[in-house]
Amino acid sequence: MKRIYKAHILYTKEQSRFEVIENGYVAVDANGCVLGVATDLASLNAQCTTSDVHCQESEVIDFGDRLLIPAMNDVHVHAPQYRNQGIAMDLELLPWLQNYTFPEEMKYADTAYAERMYRRFVHDLWRFGTMRACVFATIHTESTRLLMNLFQEAGMGALVGKVAMDRNSPEGLTESVEEMAQGYEALIEEFSHPSPLTSRPSLVRPVVTPRFIPTCTPEMLHACGQLAAKYQLPVQSHLSENKDEIALVAKLEPDSTCYGDAYHRYGLFGQTPTVMAHCVWTEGEELELMKRNSVMMAHCPTSNLNLASGLAPVRMFLEADIPVGLGSDISGGHDLNIFRMMVYAIQVSKMCYQRNHDHRFLSLSEAFWIATKSAGSFFGRVGSFEPGYEFDALVINDSDLNHDHYSLLERLERFIYLGDDRQIEHRFCRGEEVGEPQTLRT
């Protein structure tokens, strides 16, 4: 059954401009994929050439004066740090990890605690319109399985990583290479099967997740690379976030020419789809290696500011044709709202512009494209309303933002800067409306 939605439609096919369709229509097929977008039903019907059912015969859901936009994608977030949002913001990366982050993550050996926190985490992603996320869990297989089940239960998309760590970490937050591999094998067996109805990848899948090189021995990194290659799994980790971290990596991996090369030697830098968070100090050979291997940069502006890591030069990555997405990176970051990340990304780019006028700051369309189509590419054909893209969407009712006399694009801009979850009325992931996930009330 094809469904058609009517609203003011805004999305970005390309980074330089918005597609804006006033009172437009978008057709979605039974598999949750976009068939076409048009200004009227006759034009829409002409686009729907692959279906036996004419658009005139399909159900039309009219959202009236509301905005219809692609849903948000978060390409770097730590679920077990949910409770730590907004604390320890006066520390830099390495002491922040040792004194706050690692002690909190150790609690996730307790699945009852994990369920309580993870339900709240998934609920808040939903609240802010994030329908896909690339997520760090912990070393604990059972609580990682629980998190993946919660995403499945919610009907939201996620790449979830059981974190690999075996050095420079507290007792209780490390495991052997064998234990790591066994845990991954179990999760891969459970969550890597395609949808039986569509043969498309499952909405919730594992992602190989060495935390970062300082917490992983060469043996652990090698095993992670083998898992990624054997099962063709994506990879996520951290890269060049902090100067002290970079210096430590140089000592731990002296044969590597740069931080990125250390990952590359173990098959963890683009040999399968890879996203690396931060990249604040990436340059030269590392930048070229990212470009050559199509490694995505997860730009985490709030975390980079909060932990005094630096200002990531996003324009440099865009000009190098390196894919870029946005990450909330809680709890280095303090906010799960990707719309806020757009604003911070624009503001950080303006600060970079003041240091180097050769790198112009981000436009609104570029920031929106990064958060939707560019970030969405890590999950498949996600983040746009072009034909063949999975229908991940948000319906925005901005009437309480006093939108009279503004253009549709100005209304979207005002929502991004002034709005919050209260204006998001409907959320869709892969064509299905996503209702509010349950949270534990204890």
Indicate residue ranges for each PLM-predicted region.
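N-terminal metal-binding scaffold of metallo-dependent hydrolase/deaminase domains
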Residues: 1-48
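C-terminal cap of metal-dependent C-N hydrolases
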Residues: 14, 390-442
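Short polybasic linear motifs
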Residues: 46-50, 54-57, 195-198, 202
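Alpha-helical scaffold segments that flank or form the walls of functional sites
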Residues: 85-156, 180-194, 201
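Metal-coordinating catalytic core of metallo-dependent amide/deamination hydrolases
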Residues: 142-277
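His/Asp/Glu-enriched, well-ordered alpha-helical/loop segment
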Residues: 265-271, 315-402
